[in-house]
Amino acid sequence: MKSSGKHIHKALSFLLAVTMITGLLFISGCGNDMPAADGNDTDAPYKTAAEEFFLDRGDGTYTLTEAVYPKDYDGPMPLVAIAHGFKGTLNSGGAEELSHRLAEAGYAAVRMDFNPSIAPKKNADKTNLYDLKSMEADMLRAVNYMIGHHSIDTDRLGLYARSMGGGVAMTMANENSGGFDFKAVALVAPAGTDDAMVYYMGGDESWEEMKKTAREDGFIEHQGQKLTPEWFKEFEDYNPCDFGYKFADKPVLVICNTLDYVVTDETSRKCAAAYKNSRVIEVTTDNYHGYEMSYENSELKDYLMSELIDFFKDNL
């Protein structure tokens, strides 16, 4: 009987051990079967899609535009409209890479080439004629296109711009351009003061001489761009820094470079100071006006783009 009791005890111990192991295996297996978190709450990057198209400007010219957005986004997407600067293109300053990074983070991005094409074809000639007002109009056409063709959350619209485009973005934010309530603005080297472009053109005397030629000849060509009398007038008629108060306490991020001599860090800081709720990131790089953002590999680029993504995550 004693021997039988020992066997029973061993059998019970074995069954208990098996039961415990089975239970542990079951619990471990259940971990993989838990419901996934909502797709918009995960930190995993979205797969992205890109769409290239031309926007009709209504005057026989067209704006080359590209939208990049997250695939399979659940619900209306936040949107960031992107503006380049003087002489730039839709891919200037790393804008293409930034667009894809935004889309991976769950944000639609739309950017355009402000230099109009004479036909809706990529190899079509350019007019080399654009100014602040036409840039603003292009931005609004792009935003409205996105709203009309994609599911966009119009309560989560942001602006990103650099250099001359920075002044355009400041104006749009200040004035609720197009009736939109832009929620956040990020600027790299914004030419948004009353003297930023005067400085870029060589100072007051050079500015006045260029204006005179534009009046007499209809335009003056500078660095491949045709500057009309209206081009000069628009800079003189509206100083975005004077109206930053209209943006109230909505957030503005300004990035400047101590070695930038195209748009100086002093100019960038003046733009930041025009807003109640602004933050400045100051860098130092020999890539004076590019900020290394178009480099294939750059720690500075990665840092700045991460800061930009985080800024829009926090504020859109």
Model-derived features: positions:
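The serine-hydrolase catalytic nucleophile loop
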Residues: 87-99, 114, 266
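Short beta-strand/loop motif that positions the catalytic acidic residue
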Residues: 247-248, 253-256
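Conserved alpha/beta-hydrolase "acid-adjacent" motif
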Residues: 261-267
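Hydrolase active-site cap/lid region
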Residues: 172-227
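Alpha/beta-hydrolase active-site loop
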Residues: 127-150
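Conserved alpha/beta-hydrolase
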Residues: 99-122
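N-terminal cap/lid segment of alpha/beta-hydrolase-fold proteins
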Residues: 38-74
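Catalytic histidine-centered segment of alpha/beta-hydrolase-like enzymes
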Residues: 287-301
